């Protein structure tokens, strides 16, 4: 079993959580946010392509700076040559940056938000993540907690 940070290092999370240790816990809200964005951007694409271009995407998305992205408009990001040109994913990332800001106000930090979910059953956690964040479906709602060491 391998402990990892980047989701592309483990493709077993959905099939069998026992094949791969949960990812390392991020050190900041921004790292939690970046990993959520990574899961969103990767959906429907190959991990290899995303991994190969990740530094370019980081640049295009202002290093996933929550404050900067929360203030941006989708049209601004669509102009960047360094982003995946999917309007729904871009809108989702901007919305989710604003949601991370709300979570920080409500809970003090994203890890505190996740701790508040610990007493819930997995399926309830997935539903909360899908409801709270845009462009987070069932697979991402299951995969993301694994990637950030929630399990």
Tell where the protein language model's regions lie, with residue ranges.
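Alpha-helical ds-nucleic-acid-binding substructure associated with the helix-hairpin-helix region
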Residues: 60-132
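Phosphate-backbone recognition surface of nucleic-acid-processing proteins
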Residues: 125-134, 143-151
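Short helix-capping/linker segments at secondary-structure and domain boundaries
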Residues: 43-49, 100-108, 149-151
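Short amphipathic alpha-helical surface patches that mediate protein-protein
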Residues: 55-56, 98, 118, 146-149
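N-terminal polyanion-binding entry modules of DNA glycosylases/AP lyases
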Residues: 1-84
